[in-house]
From Swiss-Prot:
Gene3D superfamilies: 3.30.420.40. One of its GO terms (cellular component) is cytosol. This is Glycerol kinase. It is an enzyme of class 2 (transferase). Key enzyme in the regulation of glycerol uptake and metabolism. Catalyzes the phosphorylation of glycerol to yield sn-glycerol 3-phosphate. One of its GO terms (molecular function) is ATP binding. Belongs to the FGGY kinase family. Keywords: ATP-binding, Glycerol metabolism, Kinase, Nucleotide-binding, Transferase. The gene is glpK. One of its GO terms (biological process) is glycerol metabolic process. ATP binds at T16, T17, T265, G313, Q317, G414. Pathway: Polyol metabolism; glycerol degradation via glycerol kinase pathway; sn-glycerol 3-phosphate from glycerol: step 1/1. Inhibited by fructose 1,6-bisphosphate (FBP).
Length: 500
């Protein structure tokens, strides 16, 4: 990799459970970082909100702390890359700069009734055709509609709407830039996948005024500069990506046949499909990977197929914080290895309904097969197995949708630290699972994109080729049992569908 400049790249990763800042040097290495956990607000069952002001304050804190930890001056930062939890959205007053309500998080299911209305009115196929998405409360459109209905007595001329990237960009630039990128806009259920613009017919269906929405820009490119009152420097913001697209970029999955799975709060398996929109007959969604304008200002669009599984790492968090079965996430690996099998117990991780390939907003979580001989270790093992089984279903759907089957799964995210889970994943898939040394691929992708966009680095291929592999998990002797148990797990899932 030819290093074309000195200095640093600041990458912000604003996720579901916390907000992080990383400083990368010109060799593509992390020199400092900072993290702040984000408060989760559950006003009702099935509802989840974040305080957008808290996200902004935490963003400021992690930026400044990472810069101090790196012992550098803000003026040495060549560019900022931003990656965010997708779909989560809010409205704010552009005069006061204050949110009008807490942000509604992607996992929130309050708009399921509105989604059912859209389906009953026959809009599902139209929405899928235009956006590549299924009608689901997961996406931003119905959340924005709910906010517009709930918040009364405001002058819409003063209201701005956006996902978390738009909110933070607006704040970083001192209220000067109201924009988003194609990867985040493609998750709103309001952007036309072919044109890359807000779709007038969908805005009409959902009665969302176009003027409150941000301008859509290429993922790699200049979005603006930081207000000097923040860091005493006007730093260019040159990349914005949804978190899963950032991980795809960080792994070097930039062409058809390459895919990755991120095990975070949910699990997200994304396959790059090149410049073509691939439509799945197996309940996968078509989305944008990332976009970039060429020298002639033509926008090059990369598309992707995605299977979104809403609950994976969140299950482990629930074992710890909800039912207090474990004290740390790391314990799950030890406990799962303490028993020979799952003891006949199967878990369905449908805390927020089920995503791909079911898209059932009314499914709910459950343990099946509990007997008097079941130990806590069996419950923990069943949860880990369920995470892997969800991924298997999506891999099967991707294999059925693409011309050539997946040969290898590249992984990242917090739960991929779990060796039991990764080995079980290889066993059920029957293919190798590749875990890189750098687990924070999402933030790495944001940094790479920002640095490449500003000319800080000159070769994407060289950056990606630096990736180091920590371990490859090969399918083992557990494959046969894992495959047999998968059929029983699917039976458990069927029992959980349409529960409420």
């Amino acid at each position: 990799m030819q290093i074309s400049s000195s200095g640093y790249i600041l990458a912000l990763d604003l996720g579901t459970t916390g907000n992080r800042a990383f400083i990368f040097n010109n060799a593509g290495k992390i020199v400092a970082q900072a993290y702040k956990e984000l408060t989760q607000h559950y006003p009702q069952p099935g509802w989840l909100e974040h305080d957008a002001e808290e996200i902004w304050q935490d963003t400021c804190w992690v930026m400044k702390t990472a810069i101090v930890n790196a012992q550098i001056s803000p003026s040495e930062i060549a560019a900022i890359g931003l990656t965010v939890q997708r779909e989560t959205c809010l409205l704010w007053d552009k005069t006061t700069g204050r949110p009008l309500h807490k942000a509604i998080v992607w996992q929130d299911r309050r708009t399921a009734p509105l989604c059912h209305q859209l389906q009953e009115k026959g809009y599902a196929q139209e929405i899928y055709s235009r956006t590549g998405l299924v009608v689901d409360a997961y996406f931003s459109a119905t959340k924005l509609r709910w906010l517009l209905d709930y918040i009364t007595g405001v002058d819409l001329k003063n209201v701005l709407a956006g996902t978390i990237d738009t909110w933070i960009l607006w704040k970083l630039t001192g209220g000067k830039v109201h924009a988003t990128d194609h990867s985040n806009a493609s998750r709103t259920m309001l952007m036309n996948l072919k044109t890359g613009e807000w779709d007038e017919q969908l805005l009409e269906i959902l009665q969302i005024p176009a003027h409150i929405l941000p301008q859509i820009q290429p993922s790699l490119g200049k979005f603006g500069v930081t207000d000097t009152s923040l860091l005493d420097a006007a730093i260019p913001i040159t990349a914005i990506l949804g978190d899963q697209q950032a991980a795809l970029f960080g792994h070097g999955c930039d062409r058809p046949g390459l895919m990755k799975c991120t095990y975070g709060t949910g699990s997200f398996l994304v396959a790059h499909t090149g410049s073509n929109i691939v439509r799945s007959q197996h309940q996968l969604i078509s989305t944008i990977a990332w976009t970039q304008a060429d020298k002639q200002e033509n926008i090059n669009i990369g598309y992707a197929l995605e299977g979104s599984m809403f609950t994976s790492g969140a299950c482990i968090q629930w074992l710890r914080d909800g039912i207090k079965l474990i004290k740390t996430a790391a314990e799950t690996e030890t406990m799962a290895n303490q028993v020979a099998d799952n003891g006949g117990v199967y878990f369905v991780p449908a805390f927020s309904g089920l995503g791909a390939p079911y898209w059932d907003m009314n499914a709910r979580g459950a343990f099946f097969g509990i007997t008097a001989s079941v130990q806590p270790q069996h419950l923990v093992r069943a949860v880990l197995e369920a995470i892997a089984y969800q991924v298997l279903e999506v891999v099967q759907a991707i294999n059925a949708s693409c011309s050539s089957p997946m040969q290898r799964l590249i992984v990242d995210g917090g739960a991929c630290e779990n060796n039991f889970l990764m080995q079980f994943q290889a066993d059920v898939l029957g293919i190798p699972v590749e875990r890189p040394t750098m687990r924070d691929t999402t933030v790495q992708g944001a940094a790479f994109a920002a640095g490449l966009a500003v000319g800080f680095w000159d070769s994407y291929t060289a950056l990606v080729n630096q990736r180091q592999i920590d371990r490859i998990f090969e399918p083992g002797e557990g494959s046969q049992n894992a495959t047999a148990n998968f059929a029983i797990w699917q039976k458990a899932v069927k029992r959980s569908l349409d529960w409420v």
